[in-house]
Amino acid sequence: MDRRIAKTKRAIFQAFLTLLNDKGYDHMRVQDVIDLADVGRSTFYAHYASKEALLEELCHDLFHHLFTGREDADVKTLLVHIFKHFRTNQDRVASLLLSRNAYFLRELEAELKHDIFPKVAEDYMQDKRNLPEDLLVHFVVTTFVETVSWWLQQRKKVDEATLTDYFIRLLA
């Protein structure tokens, strides 16, 4: 990628993240991103069709490597990895998760349903097999989202291994 294009995209992305933390997604306008990134409107739209497209790229960046190539990992290792990734990207994750952004939550929930639920169900929910699967999926996914939300709001940080233990104990 051309360095000028990469620099422009970084400026737009950084402005988006700053505004996400300052204003929240719902109160942010494309014009706010343009002003903070110090780019022209046509430049913004040359790279992104909308603020939704920018959010989509952010979600892709956050989730892409999380669940790819981890099929063989055990549940605890996978969860610790995810929590570490969320801590590393706390500025992005916290803003989106705590704002309850619908797109972000849908993307996160889809990834969790596909990649986390089967492992958790296999290892920790054997005694709950007589319950409807869609209820179990909903329970695991919402418990995960709420656990991460709680964790991101804590003043005294809990390490990822301890958080993994808390999450698994909630499910057992």
What are these regions (language model features)?
Residues 38-47, 144:
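Short hydrophobic/aromatic patch on the recognition helix
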Residues 20, 29-30, 44, 51-59:
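Amphipathic alpha-helical segments enriched in hydrophobic/aromatic and basic residues
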Residues 101-146:
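Amphipathic alpha-helical packing segments from all-alpha helical-bundle domains
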Residues 1-23, 27, 32:
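Basic, helix-initiating cap at the start of DNA-binding domains
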Residues 12, 27, 39, 50-55:
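Short amphipathic alpha-helical segment with a characteristic S/N-K-E followed by hydrophobic residues
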Residues 18, 28, 58-82, 93-95:
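Amphipathic alpha-helical linker/stalk segments
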Residues 12, 31-36, 44, 86:
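Append "Primarily bacterial transcriptional regulators
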Residues 150-172:
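C-terminal peripheral helix-coil segments that are non-catalytic and often amphipathic
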